[in-house]
Amino acid sequence: MPWIQLKIDTDNQHADALSDLLMEEGSLSITLEDGKDTPIYEPTLGETPLWNHTVLTALFEADRDLAIVVEQLKLQPYLGEDFSYKIEQVEDKDWEREWMDNFHPIKFGERLWICPSWREIPDPDAVNIILDPGLAFGTGTHPTTALCLEWLDSLDFADKEVIDFGCGSGILAVAALKLGATKVTGIDIDYQAIDASKANAERNGVEDQLALFLPEDQPKDLQADILVANILAGPLRELAPLIAEKVKTGGQLALSGLLKEQAEEVAEFYTQWFDMDEPAHKEDWSRLTGIRK
């Protein structure tokens, strides 16, 4: 079944009202995109910001007369007679298959591969993690996750215990276990992340070595030889003392989820406990590493 879509240039003040109106006019879905590709890296807690220049795309069934919809839109005072819009035909596709075709095995470092379950493993002798893309948590495609995976691939995990602080999908925890860690503790504030980590550990056969906790449930004396935290700059600053006390003397630390321009400032929060290395960068993002004093 073919579709037709209406694209409208609007702003962050009127996007919600416009979305409601288009749904009333029979739109099947609404998508909001940044008209100028302006990134939002770290919104305020509870905030879901929109862009000043927002492109709204409304999808309709092909037999809907969009000329009628456009006439209704012209009556809205915040749009007026001369608002910018575009009508496009949408090819009918197997969207699930097309989505799956976009994901391929990815190699990190020398040993580590992340592979979707529907793809053939490129190197059976490598360290392979089976992980399917999800909506909320990391799958290795984001630069910060890639930076952490590359760092983990470089380590010797013999007789080492690890903390994955902000475990999300569990991708870093599972990677550490597949690379040889004896035990990993994953901590996250989101119970859905705990469930996702557990499921991914089970899929990769390492669930018996992974302990998962919400912050309030974690052991009070928890420490590890290696700690990786891929969260955001704000929490990394605020939680520096807590993170530091979880790393044993001589232990290794990796922090990511921060932008290049944030790296130096965040590193300063850790220098009293760690000998910090020079940051590593990928695209606009950075990773900090250090050794516990």
From Swiss-Prot:
<keyword id="KW-0949">S-adenosyl-L-methionine</keyword>
<comment type="similarity">
    <text>Belongs to the methyltransferase superfamily. PrmA family.</text>
</comment>
<dbReference type="GO" id="GO:0005829">
    <property type="term" value="C:cytosol"/>
</dbReference>
<keyword id="KW-0489">Methyltransferase</keyword>
<comment type="function">
    <text>Methylates ribosomal protein L11.</text>
</comment>
<dbReference type="InterPro" id="IPR029063">
    <property type="entry name" value="SAM-dependent_MTases_sf"/>
</dbReference>
<feature type="binding site">
    <location>
        <position position="230"/>
    </location>
    <ligand>
        <name>S-adenosyl-L-methionine</name>
    </ligand>
</feature>
<feature type="binding site">
    <location>
        <position position="166"/>
    </location>
    <ligand>
        <name>S-adenosyl-L-methionine</name>
    </ligand>
</feature>
<feature type="binding site">
    <location>
        <position position="188"/>
    </location>
    <ligand>
        <name>S-adenosyl-L-methionine</name>
    </ligand>
</feature>
<dbReference type="GO" id="GO:0032259">
    <property type="term" value="P:methylation"/>
</dbReference>
<dbReference type="GO" id="GO:0016279">
    <property type="term" value="F:protein-lysine N-methyltransferase activity"/>
</dbReference>
<feature type="binding site">
    <location>
        <position position="145"/>
    </location>
    <ligand>
        <name>S-adenosyl-L-methionine</name>
    </ligand>
</feature>
<keyword id="KW-0963">Cytoplasm</keyword>
<dbReference type="InterPro" id="IPR050078">
    <property type="entry name" value="Ribosomal_L11_MeTrfase_PrmA"/>
</dbReference>
<protein>
    <recommendedName>
        <fullName>Ribosomal protein L11 methyltransferase</fullName>
        <ecNumber>2.1.1.-</ecNumber>
    </recommendedName>
</protein>
<dbReference type="InterPro" id="IPR004498">
    <property type="entry name" value="Ribosomal_PrmA_MeTrfase"/>
</dbReference>
<keyword id="KW-0808">Transferase</keyword>
<dbReference type="Pfam" id="PF06325">
    <property type="entry name" value="PrmA"/>
</dbReference>
